[in-house]
């Protein structure tokens, strides 16, 4: 039987085995999906052993996305633009393709599930880490009017924006760009995406409420049983809509499943089941 797995550290909390098991049942695919905890330096050996057997694909979570990027024999355009791999695919000739489905998972959630518009909109992205790098190609393909990436280290945001400058109006800056007191513009945005992990620790990124209006749609890549701290903050300052990252998680998993099996699962019942189980 074809086997798949997700690797990371930590990994016990991963919902990927549950998600892919539901996808397999829904689409009547025969497969096994497990999780494996790896220590730093163990990725290459584990992947080689897995693919030498019945292994057909691996999902990769932190901190091994760079290891997977280096392990792949070939990289997709999405993986190249992200600089990271979250999905490995064993092809018919035995070679390994590296893919990144994080960005398409997020964009599909925003445009298809939430029905928010990105085209022609002003978009603020908070953070400039690996999670943000993975979403910029599909985001820029939506033709937003303007994208501003803000990060504690301004140079990191600037470097990230520069990689996608040929695709449209995108720039990077420090958090001070949003503060009138520090000479910034302090303007409002149509869509705000939190790509930091601050909500996991109950914290907030240092951005002013003035970025939100009563038409702003606010997305936190983090998810949980309750609205995240970033969502609550946005709601308290009058945002029109807020969402957490569960749809992104299920969406990137659905894209991985499609790349592996050639069938697109319906994510709606899986989303509903995960919400009920939280």
UniProtKB/Swiss-Prot annotation:
Tell me which Gene Ontology terms the entry assigns under biological process: amino acid biosynthetic process; aromatic amino acid family biosynthetic process; chorismate biosynthetic process; shikimate metabolic process
Q: Which positions in this protein are listed as binding shikimate? A: 14-16, 61, 86, 102, 223
User: Which EC class is this protein assigned?
Assistant: oxidoreductase
Q: According to the lineage, what is the superkingdom?
A: Bacteria
Q: Does the keyword Amino-acid biosynthesis apply?
A: yes
Q: In which pathway does it act?
A: Metabolic intermediate biosynthesis; chorismate biosynthesis; chorismate from D-erythrose 4-phosphate and phosphoenolpyruvate: step 4/7
Reaction(s) catalysed (UniProt annotation): shikimate + NADP(+) = 3-dehydroshikimate + NADPH + H(+)
Which Gene3D superfamilies does the annotation name?
A: Leucine Dehydrogenase, chain A, domain 1 (3.40.50.10860), NAD(P)-binding Rossmann-like Domain (3.40.50.720)
Q: Where does NADP(+) bind?
A: 127-131, 151-156, 221, 245
Enzyme active site:
65 (proton acceptor)
Which Enzyme Commission number(s) are listed?
1.1.1.25
Q: Name one GO cellular component term.
A: cytosol
Coiled-coil ranges (or none): none
Cytoplasm among keywords: no
| InterPro entries in UniProt | Aminoacid_DH-like_N_sf, NAD(P)-bd_dom_sf, SDH_C, Shikimate_DH, Shikimate_DH-bd_N, Shikimate_DH_fam, Shikm_DH/Glu-tRNA_Rdtase
Name the keywords, alphabetized. Amino-acid biosynthesis, Aromatic amino acid biosynthesis, NADP, Oxidoreductase
For this UniProt entry, the molecular function terms from Gene Ontology, in alphabetical order, are: NADP binding; shikimate 3-dehydrogenase (NADP+) activity
As for family, the record states: Belongs to the shikimate dehydrogenase family.
The protein's assembly and partners: Homodimer.
Purpose: Involved in the biosynthesis of the chorismate, which leads to the biosynthesis of aromatic amino acids. Catalyzes the reversible NADPH linked reduction of 3-dehydroshikimate (DHSA) to yield shikimate (SA).
Q: This protein is called what?
A: Shikimate dehydrogenase (NADP(+))
Q: Recite the lineage of the species.
A: Bacteria, Pseudomonadati, Pseudomonadota, Gammaproteobacteria, Cellvibrionales
